Amino acid sequence: YERIVWQYWENSDTYPDGIPYIDLCHESVDLHQTDGKGYKVIRLNDKNYQEYIDDINPYIFNLKESENQLAQKADYIRAKLLYKHGGIWLDSDAIVFRELDMIFDKLEHYEFYGYKINSPCIWAFACHKNAEIMKKWVDNNDKILNESQGKNIFYGEMGHRSIEIFINTPNIFLDDATKVQSIDHRYAWKYMHFTNGLEKFINDEQPFFMMNNALICDYIKKYTREELKYSNILISQFLIKAGVKF
């Protein structure tokens, strides 16, 4: 398997110029790519992703530019991409603290490594190219697109809902998701202003933390780099720990 970390980001109609904290999350991934055994970062966008995947289902282009629809487009892309190439997928709201060797090392023993038992969290996973579960996920997404023609697809239908039906596939391992995301998403907004966030949510062995952009308040998405630098919100605490330069 190749030591590649894949990411995808496309600006939505709501944030046509991007989201500053997402840029900083990307920088945290880049910052640690020479740590440990190292990894290469390939970050895709709406202009270049077609260079990396084949046989794109034409119905994917019926999805609109809303954040909800772009999330579904990213679900389709990540499945196709990692099936073809293998490596690690990280959503763009991941803040990386250290080397990712502990994740890559899982691929010495399994075809697929992910988080959350019974329903894989697709915001972060690792796999070999041509992994059996990835083939099933890709095929199921094509089935969903062909039947819907890319219209009225609900959130997660091509993501965790699509892959979770294949969790009994041999040679996969699903780990405890709280190892990398210990915030209850239902109450994420309550934790943004914790002053002791590192102590509460991060341990020394943790490779990254997933912020879950869909649940981040709009006013925080509008914070500039300068505002994030001097803020003590949870995102800023994590970015500082990651070593990002604002």
Task: State where each predicted segment sits.
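Small-residue hinge/turn detector
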Residues: 75-87
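Glycosyltransferase-associated regions of secretory-pathway enzymes
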Residues: 1-74, 90-246
